């Protein structure tokens, strides 16, 4: 009986071992024959994992002109642990670096990781790459990795397009996508559309022999993944108009922004002084950035969305529209600008008095607009100045003042349209009134606007009461894949009938016998505009102008600001008029005006 039990146990034990052994054999077969990932691990010492960086998407203007493309460069990569018996003198000679530079780079690579590849020398030219490639087999642990850099064929739109640079450690820590040495959009639409532009990385596994020679792909590329190029961007920018605007603004400080009112697409976006965007590309970027950053005329400052200026007289129509909407004035209301009517804000133009809103806009009469503001701040339908001011401010914010417009450009500022609490804090609750803040009525004092806000305001008027967020990119990936800005209609709280009154006044700026921009009317084109002369903290005046055309079916709205250049009619108005002519007619006939604007140097004003 005992022997039988023993025999049964022996059978069970043997069977168990046989089953376990069979399982191990099956697993071993799977590992060695079917699942090659273990082979990858076993052969890690002779395999090289090379990231395939995708080309960033291209950027086009509204007519298909190429604004940004890619150019091939090469990074010399190093895996410190694999570096053996390297002729440092030879590699230093090929790269044009010192022995000290070699050791600094190697230390940085070891600190990053002895086992992983990192950039030893970045952005090697094609010529240098050719020399190195021939001798690369002599430098164990080194290999070349292709990259691309941005190129700007027309050398325009630096603030609009932006630039790319290396990711920071903070950005690496926050992302699963970026690794040390990767590039990322830093400003402009390169930053705003980074995810769309960057593409998807790929990976190639290459076999390398003991002489550091690439002997082919592992498993015929079975485990490789291809990089996917980033999506192209199709912008609303008119490259010819942009180039022309930059020519007009040469040797001047300021900004031009133009919009298609029907869509909100930005046609021209420039900040002056600007710079050639190619300066911030490649190995010279760091040096050039330092030069630009230290330049006293601030070429890196994006004045179009970060410059906050007093709007001056361009703001007067906004005040008029609020007065009309609140019912404190009508189109027939007249105010005098002589005698007591010229106090506390004097008139700076010679014209008939009293005058109505049409004449006041045409001739930019300060006292008229101050008295409109005083009427608003005395409206008997509200209990106090604070309530009246809050209503006034709410109307203005519906026009796009005092808030961000949610454009597709980074670092947009909102200007300044202070809430009533600010004046409570400055003057005391209940201790301020229209007289206290009278400068607001003519676009001075605390009110500040960006050029983007002013052109958006002109666009809102052109559309008779609404606007779409100003934006640069109209579609991503292909021209049919539109951005969603066209679904974001913003409606101002002003009735169309009151906007039409203001538009008629703006037409008279060009067409009236005393219009402040009558000298810059384009024949056979209906135009509406407003000059602005805004005093700055330096005591000098900025030259401001907003306009749109044609009045009946607006195709362009524009804002021009020329810093410390004097009257709006002297510089900003003619520049805006030339830009409108260029866009609508594709040529400019008024050569004398054009030459005067192009040749003027106002940087030393």
Feature-to-residue mapping (PLM):
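Beta-lactam-recognizing serine transpeptidase/beta-lactamase-like catalytic domain environment
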Residues: 68, 209-214, 219-221, 262-314, ...
């Amino acid at each position: 009986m005992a022997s039988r039990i023993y025999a049964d146990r022996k059978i069970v034990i043997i069977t168990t071992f046989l089953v376990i052994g069979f399982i191990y054999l099956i697993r071993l077969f799977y590992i060695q024959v079917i699942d090659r990932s273990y082979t990858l691990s076993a052969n890690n010492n002779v395999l090289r994992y090379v990231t395939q960086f995708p080309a960033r998407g291209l950027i086009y203007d509204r007519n298909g002109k190429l604004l940004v493309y890619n150019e091939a460069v090469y990074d010399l990569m190093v895996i410190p642990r694999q570096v053996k018996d390297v002729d440092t003198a030879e590699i230093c000679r090929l790269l044009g670096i010192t022995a000290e530079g070699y050791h600094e780079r190697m230390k940085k690579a070891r600190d990053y990781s002895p086992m992983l590849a990192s950039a030893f020398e970045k952005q090697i030219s094609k010529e240098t790459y050719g020399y190195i490639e021939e001798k690369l087999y002599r430098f164990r642990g080194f290999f070349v990795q292709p990259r691309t850099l941005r190129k700007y064929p027309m050398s325009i739109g630096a603030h609009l397009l932006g630039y790319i640079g290396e990711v920071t450690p903070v950005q690496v820590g926050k992302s699963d996508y970026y690794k040390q040495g990767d590039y990322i959009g830093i400003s402009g639409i390169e930053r705003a559309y980074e995810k769309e532009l960057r593409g998807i990385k790929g990976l190639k596994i290459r076999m390398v022999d003991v002489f550091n020679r690439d002997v082919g792909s592992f498993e015929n590329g079975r485990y490789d993944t291809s990089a996917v190029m980033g999506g192209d961007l199709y912008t609303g920018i008119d490259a010819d108009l942009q180039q022309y605007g930059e020519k007009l603004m040469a040797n001047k400080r300021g900004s031009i922004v133009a919009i298609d009112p029907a869509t909100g697409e930005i046609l021209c976006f420039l900040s002056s002084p600007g710079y050639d965007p190619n300066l911030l590309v490649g190995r010279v970027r760091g040096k050039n950035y330092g030069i630009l950053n230290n330049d006293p005329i601030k070429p890196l400052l994006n004045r179009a969305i970060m410059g906050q200026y007093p709007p001056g007289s361009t703001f007067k129509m906004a005040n008029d529209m609020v007065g009309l909407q609140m019912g404190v004035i009508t189109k027939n209301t007249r105010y005098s600008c002589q005698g007591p009517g010229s106090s506390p804000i004097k008139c700076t133009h010679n014209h008939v008095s009293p005058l109505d809103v049409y004449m006041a806009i045409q001739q930019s009469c300060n006292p008229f607009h101050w008295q409109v503001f005083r009427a608003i701040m005395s409206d008997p339908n509200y209990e106090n100045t604070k309530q009246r001011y809050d209503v006034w401010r709410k109307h203005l914010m519906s026009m796009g003042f005092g808030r961000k417009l949610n454009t597709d450009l980074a670092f947009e500022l909102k200007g300044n349209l202070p809430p009533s609490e600010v004046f409570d804090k400055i003057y005391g609750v209940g201790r301020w009134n229209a007289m206290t803040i009278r400068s607001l009525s003519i676009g001075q004092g605390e009110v500040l606007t960006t050029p983007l806000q002013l052109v958006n305001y002109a666009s809102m008027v052109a559309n008779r009461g609404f606007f779409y967020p100003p934006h640069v990119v109209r579609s991503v990936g292909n021209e049919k894949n539109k951005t969603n800005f066209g679904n974001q209609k913003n409606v101002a709280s002003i009735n169309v009938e009151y906007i039409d009154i203001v538009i008629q006044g703006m037409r008279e700026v060009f067409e009236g016998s005393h219009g402040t921009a009558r000298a810059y009317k384009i024949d056979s084109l209906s135009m509406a505009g407003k000059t602005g002369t805004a005093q700055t903290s330096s005591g000098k005046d900025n030259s401001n102008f907003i306009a749109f055309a044609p009045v009946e079916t607006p195709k362009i709205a524009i804002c021009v600001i020329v810093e410390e250049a004097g009257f709006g009619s002297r510089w900003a108005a003619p520049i805006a008029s030339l830009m409108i002519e260029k866009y609508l007619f594709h040529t400019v006939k008024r050569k004398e005006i054009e030459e005067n604007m192009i040749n003027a140097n106002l940087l030393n004003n």
